[in-house]
């Protein structure tokens, strides 16, 4: 199976720019069969039926297979196959053919097979970890509605891996995770404006009474305030936090209150934090919206906020 995955991945990478629409359709059907066969095989899991961790050798084998599958899905979603359809089809048929040959369906079938296999054990492999979060960020940006339609268990696993990525020390993994979160939050924020379903039941409150977006907002704020080397993450973090704050106002206010209460015995610090939180959501002409101009404004606001908040909270 590992050899089949490797050959398929290499074939898609090498040939996708040179195919015509009919050949792209064939490749998609073939890759879907590979994904379905792999999913049915039960391979790639890093735990035995008894729940004990497998040997390091078995973990490495699972890593190689899952990474090959991720690479195949990444090549499929890169745009080369879509471009091949558009460029080879008659102009009046290109759009219809691109919709008919559902590349996203294959990629999401692959994600459905991969997500249950992505554990902390496999994410310890740097190359696989980066590959997974790069693909996740792309799919959440390009197809958030399809992500919202995932079964609850798959969506929950995906969110667990996203939380892992948001806390990861690797800068690339952190940035891709924040990009993925920003795409998901923007989808939910825009859905609320248009009164469409958005993430639907996936937004149900957890045991602490907060939604998944509010939970990840709190996690990200804590990382930005308390951990080292965060200013190189400000742009991606800001793009993720802005739509969450706009959609989760009460949760954001509760978060601000929690930070301020941590310095309640220092009136000067309370004033500094209160003013910083006000400026975060109002300075530089910040408006309601997640357009490009507003994102740039919020990036500046977040950088200024962190300068104050880290100075106040990290000295205690």
Segments the model singles out, each with a brief description of its role:
Residues 1-316:
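Karyopherin-beta/Importin-beta family HEAT-repeat alpha-solenoid scaffold
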């Amino acid at each position: 199976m590992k050899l089949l995955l490797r050959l398929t991945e290499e074939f898609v990478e090498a040939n996708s720019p040179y195919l015509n629409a009919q050949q792209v359709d064939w490749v998609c059907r073939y890759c879907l069969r590979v994904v379905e066969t792999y999913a049915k095989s039960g391979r790639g899991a890093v735990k035995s039926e008894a729940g004990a961790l497998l040997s390091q050798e078995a973990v490495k084998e699972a890593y190689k297979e899952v990474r090959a599958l991720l690479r195949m899905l990444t090549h499929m979603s890169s745009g080369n196959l879509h471009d091949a359809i558009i460029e080879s089809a008659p102009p009046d048929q290109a759009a219809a053919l691109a919709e008919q040959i559902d590349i996203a369906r294959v990629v999401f079938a692959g994600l459905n097979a991969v997500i249950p296999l992505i554990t902390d054990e496999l994410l310890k492999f740097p190359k696989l970890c980066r590959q997974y979060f790069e693909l996740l960020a792309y799919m959440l940006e390009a197809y958030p509605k399809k992500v919202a339609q995932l079964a609850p268990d798959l969506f929950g696993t995906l969110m667990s891996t996203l939380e892992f990525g948001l806390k990861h020390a690797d800068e690339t993994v952190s940035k891709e995770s924040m990009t993925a979160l920003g795409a998901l939050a923007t989808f939910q924020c825009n859905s609320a404006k248009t009164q469409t379903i958005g993430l639907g039941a996936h937004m149900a409150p957890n045991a602490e009474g907060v939604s998944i977006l509010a939970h990840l907002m709190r996690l990200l704020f804590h990382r930005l305030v308390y951990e080292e080397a965060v200013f190189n993450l400000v742009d991606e973090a800001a793009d993720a936090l802005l739509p969450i704050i706009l959609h989760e106002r009460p949760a954001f206010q509760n978060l601000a209150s929690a930070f301020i209460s941590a310095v309640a015995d220092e009136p000067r610090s309370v004033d500094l934090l209160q003013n910083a939180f006000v400026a975060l959501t109002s300075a530089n002409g910040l408006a309601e919206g997640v357009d490009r101009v507003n994102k740039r404004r919020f990036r500046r606001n977040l950088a200024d906020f962190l300068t104050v908040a880290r100075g106040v909270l990290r000295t205690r």
